Amino acid sequence: MAELEFEKPVVELRNKIRELKEYTKHSQMDFSEEIRILEDKLENLEEEIYGNMKVWDRVQIARHAERPTTLDYIEHLFTDFFECHGDRFFGDDAAIVGGIAKYNGMPVTVIGHQRGKDTKENIRRNFGMPHPEGYRKALRLMKQAEKFNRPIICFIDTKGAYPGKAAEERGQSEAIARNLFEMAGLTVPVICIVIGEGGSGGALGLGVGDYIYMLENSTYSVISPEGAATILWKDATKARDAAEALKITAADLKELGVIDEIIPESRGGAHRNILKQSENINVVLQKTFEQLSGISKDELIEKRYEKYMKIGQVSFSNASIWVK
């Protein structure tokens, strides 16, 4: 498993314990007490490092090469998944996957960004950066879900929409804007979960819903830290400072009222235990569907509208405003 810079002390101690256990198997000496001491030390070290992570540490975890993807969660949370392809205008975009599935026996539509697990797959999926046809495919599936009264679950995990010339020529901005407009008025429940990086408009194209959740170590921002640093300071190496300033973590966005709830992760990140992470997501999904049950279509749209109108409101209760 790939290690991140800030967690090297944990990895080194974990490896030392594993080596000692392996040596014990082939030795007549008893190292059980030494192993116990090291395991206690590891527990304290993990609590210290993972319990005091900086924003940049969370950015690294959100980008981890082994972090679970949309298809991983589909496999663990849903049954009878049938993937649908194509936008019926131009083509199919592998950077967004979507289809019909069952959640606890209930028909649902599942859509999400999909990055690759290796170089070959990343190239095929364009590193999880969708083209316009990806967003149009997603919208086609959303409208289909609305027609057949299926709830929609969106998994968000992208650095951003692909900014290439061909994507712009095929209407990248229009495709994203159309999704925002249409998702706001869907008459079926929409649940959005940021599972990795939530980058700019590319994330928003799947991010308008009745409930917005973020995994504990995911990020959600208008621009990448590197991009912000380049614009503000003409220096991409100041990405750490930009990450702090952007307020991109789940805790920041919960405090700002942008998201509804934080889904906890296993210590060290979701990639450490995908089964446990899927269980954590499942708990939230079950609770959310209970909250959404019995709500009429008109009330659903009204509550969604009110939700987004509250985001970004500024209180002037302690300030004087002079208008000339």
Swiss-Prot record:
Leader sequence segment: none
Pathway(s) per entry: Lipid metabolism; malonyl-CoA biosynthesis; malonyl-CoA from acetyl-CoA: step 1/1
SUPFAM superfamilies to which the protein is assigned, alphabetical: ClpP/crotonase (SSF52096)
One GO CC annotation: acetyl-CoA carboxylase complex
Keywords tagged on the record: ATP-binding, Cytoplasm, Fatty acid biosynthesis, Fatty acid metabolism, Lipid biosynthesis, Lipid metabolism, Nucleotide-binding, Transferase
Enzyme class: transferase
This enzyme's EC code(s): 2.1.3.15
Gene Ontology terms describing biological process: fatty acid biosynthetic process; malonyl-CoA biosynthetic process
Segments forming domain CoA carboxyltransferase C-terminal: 37-291
Subcellular compartments: Cytoplasm
Gene Ontology MF annotations: acetyl-CoA carboxylase activity; ATP binding; carboxyl- or carbamoyltransferase activity
InterPro entries in alphabetical order: Acetyl_CoA_COase_a_su (IPR001095), ClpP/crotonase-like_dom_sf (IPR029045), COA_CT_C (IPR011763)
Cystine pairings recorded for this chain: none
Catalytic activity: N(6)-carboxybiotinyl-L-lysyl-[protein] + acetyl-CoA = N(6)-biotinyl-L-lysyl-[protein] + malonyl-CoA
Function: Component of the acetyl coenzyme A carboxylase (ACC) complex. First, biotin carboxylase catalyzes the carboxylation of biotin on its carrier protein (BCCP) and then the CO(2) group is transferred by the carboxyltransferase to acetyl-CoA to form malonyl-CoA.
Family under the similarity heading: Belongs to the AccA family.
Assembly information from the UniProt record: Acetyl-CoA carboxylase is a heterohexamer composed of biotin carboxyl carrier protein (AccB), biotin carboxylase (AccC) and two subunits each of ACCase subunit alpha (AccA) and ACCase subunit beta (AccD).
Name used for this protein in its record: Acetyl-coenzyme A carboxylase carboxyl transferase subunit alpha
